[in-house]
Amino acid sequence: MQWAVGRRWVWAALLLAVAAVLAQVVWLWLGTQSFVFQHEEIAQLARQYAGLDHELAFSRLIVELRRLHPGHVLPDEELQWVFVNAGGWMGAMCLLHASLSEYVLLFGTALGSRGHSGETVVHGPGEATAVEWGPNTWMVEYGRGVIPSTLAFALTDTIFSTQDFLTLFYTLRAYARGLRLEFTTYLFGQDP
């Protein structure tokens, strides 16, 4: 019995050590990662098309991103608007680009919504933000980091609150398509 308890501690310590090493490897990888998109580029394109009808603005933005980054934006037949419930807010998103370290998506709400930013390492204690979007708010969203780790926040409301498993499937399929596109572009060049 004593040996069994001791073995559990050894396994727990080993698991903790593996997790620490894995976290360090991911941290180092992100530090050396070259990104496809730049914050300034996405912001400039968003400003360029601001004020247009959102459908026209989004279609022009997609064309421009494909021109600037061939092989990194999903083709039209794989673009799909998906409902999103996260942090208490609701809207719709269309994933344009996804990799292990960055994403670009279109997001909006026709009715307006509010919620919170979630708990992240960016926000210290008491610094999490509330968000509120009015009716017909549409935007381009760009994110960097360990993207698979953000899926917990993005999908928790869908799994445990709305239990909309079809939306869960569509969301995961969109992300898988983005990863597949990045992988084939990496292996075969810009025209997978």
Features from the language model and the residues they span:
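Short acidic-glycine-tyrosine-enriched beta hairpin
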Residues: 109-133
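Double-stranded beta-helix
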Residues: 134-189
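Glycine- and acidic-residue-biased ligand/ion/polar-headgroup-sensing regions
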Residues: 101, 106-111
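Conserved hydrophobic/aromatic beta-strand scaffold that supports enzyme active sites
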Residues: 93-95, 120, 130, 139
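Eukaryotic short linear interaction motifs
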Residues: 103, 130, 148-150
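Tight coil/turn sites that cap or link beta-strands
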Residues: 99-101, 124-126, 136
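A short, N-terminal "cap"/entry segment at the start of jelly-roll beta-barrel domains
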Residues: 25-99, 186-192
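N-terminal Sec-pathway targeting helices
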Residues: 1-17
